[in-house]
């Protein structure tokens, strides 16, 4: 374990790895153990490496609407993590922003990781400047936005209350462009959210009119 941990820490492994699994070198003995819902035997142990942490400066907070939920996203100075450059991370909801104690000014210092070596995540605030402001309107349709409290009585999320907001078409649009639908390459849910929030996609037909925004997209 120490040997492989040292290799990972010193960057001596060419292929990105997120953990280490140790198995018994005895299949007969391994078969005598119990099983789990995910594994055929308990013949091994899995270890996860400690997440690499980067400190960076917040540039601004972007609010993105998808299926009526308006999510805060931290946009920050580029940092190199786990083999890629990262510039943004979801802040989940208002409650998470409060827990982190995030500010909104450019001098706010953030701690960023890649959860499971994939998803950028803000895990802490080194120092905060200013205080974030919650938008009063939806960034997509400009209708009134409302803070709702979840069933746990604690989690606060921001929602667009316009029943005809284009962002509420996300699931239908995702099905439309999927392999089972029109099989349109390059339009993932993540990209659909961006294009909807920019006002480039408002319905099915607008997907075929994206050429109008070619200069903005490339």
Q: What role is predicted for each listed range?
A:
Residues 1-218:
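RNA/tRNA-interacting regions in translation and RNA-turnover enzymes
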């Amino acid at each position: 374990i120490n040997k492989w941990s040292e290799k990972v820490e010193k960057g001596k492994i060419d292929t990105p790895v997120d953990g280490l699994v140790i198995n018994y070198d005895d299949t007969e003995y391994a078969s005598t153990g119990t099983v789990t819902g995910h594994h055929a035997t308990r013949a091994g142990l899995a270890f996860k490496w400690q997440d690499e942490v980067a400190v960076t400066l917040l540039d601004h907070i972007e609010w993105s609407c998808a299926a009526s939920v308006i999510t805060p996203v931290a946009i920050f100075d580029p940092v190199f993590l786990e083999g890629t450059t990262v510039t943004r991370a979801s802040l989940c909801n208002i409650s998470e922003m409060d827990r982190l104690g995030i500010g909104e000014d450019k001098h706010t210092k953030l701690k960023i990781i890649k959860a499971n070596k994939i998803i950028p995540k803000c895990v802490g605030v080194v120092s905060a400047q200013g205080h974030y402001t919650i938008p009063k309107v939806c960034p997509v349709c400009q209708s009134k936005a409302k803070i709702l409290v979840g069933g746990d009585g604690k989690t606060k999320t921001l929602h667009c209350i316009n029943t005809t907001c284009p962002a509420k078409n996300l699931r239908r649009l995702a099905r439309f462009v999927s392999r089972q639908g029109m099989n349109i390459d390059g339009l993932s849910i993540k990209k659909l959210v961006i294009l909807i929030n920019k006002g480039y996609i408002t319905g099915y037909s607008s997907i075929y009119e994206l050429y109008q925004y070619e200069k903005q997209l490339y």
